């Protein structure tokens, strides 16, 4: 399995991403609801019952003042919005902005899950190397311990040397057990992220060439390209359109109304009535208990809230980028030194073994060299994977991880229109 395949499996199967996709699909339906405001409404109203009427027409009949009849009525009515204070176009724009927000949020979720997949993928590879190092270290201790035990049995070695050798052997075995548990944990995390077991994992190529030359370029890419930031900007647009929607009640509403009706025995008059009408109807609210004004003010505050959320998102993303960049730079400086440490320690062990064959080193000296080599190799492995993962963190912060890994995201991750963030970091003084 390659790293790209692992990320693709995560994107295809992770429930967190599926939840975001369903959120987008729900927003798509809201757009259809909003566009329904452009279409006419057609209603059929019908009724049947008994009606008692006391009216001038019934009183004119003489003998009694009331008329009780079985009545029925039916009306077919069409109403087409002509002007609604720009409510419908602004509501359509608001829901479309929400769709864009959900689409970019899917992208952001996919980027986060991809980075998590990279983390668990590299962790499995690292832990497998750690297990191999611990196993080799244990085998080296067993060889030396066998030699010390043999010398002790022949009366050449001391009991103290044997005890010390046994203690170091126990520690080496314990180190192997610990690394095996760490590997099992890493494999469990891998399955949780990808939904697949980590069988044969290919070592991914280094992404050193994918990282910008300096943090300023990376920061600019974050501001231009990070999907979470674009999602927050789309929420700002949605809040602005919600403010325009809140203005609609301050305008009169005009509708074209077409209706036809058929009635029997209504209003105390026996007989059948057929009517039709065509009219432009105006509805203009003059006072609504100040509720419309309060809704407008609430929408204005929502705009400010969404802008603050967007600006805070940029600060968090910039912080994450800076931390990832610092970790990358630190690991880059440490990796060559850790490699030198491992190389020189390996040479020292070889020299110790040669000196031991000449009688210039003891078996305990060999154990010391084995422990030193194990520590050096563990350190080099740790720093090497830390450097690699920190580079992936930088790429993910820029919103480029999925693209560079050629991962196919769901169709719902595509926004209706491109969104450019207007957030800017405060000046650094």
Locations of regions flagged by a protein language model:
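Amphipathic alpha-helical coiled-coil segments
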Residues: 19-34, 109, 113-132, 143, ...
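Acidic, glycine-rich loop-and-beta core segments that form the ion-binding/anion-interacting portion
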Residues: 215-263
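Membrane-embedded beta-strand positions in outer-membrane beta-barrel channels/transporters
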Residues: 7, 75-77, 121, 279-281, ...
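Periplasmic alpha-helical coiled-coil/stalk elements that build and connect Gram-negative outer-membrane
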Residues: 112-223, 324-327, 331, 372-373, ...
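Transmembrane beta-barrel architecture of outer-membrane proteins
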Residues: 71-73, 119, 164, 275-277
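Acidic, low-complexity, intrinsically disordered peripheral segments
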Residues: 52, 379-429
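Small/polar (Gly/Ser/Thr/Ala-rich) solvent-exposed segments
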Residues: 18, 41-68, 79-108, 230, ...
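Regulatory alphaC helix of protein kinase catalytic domains
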Residues: 1-7
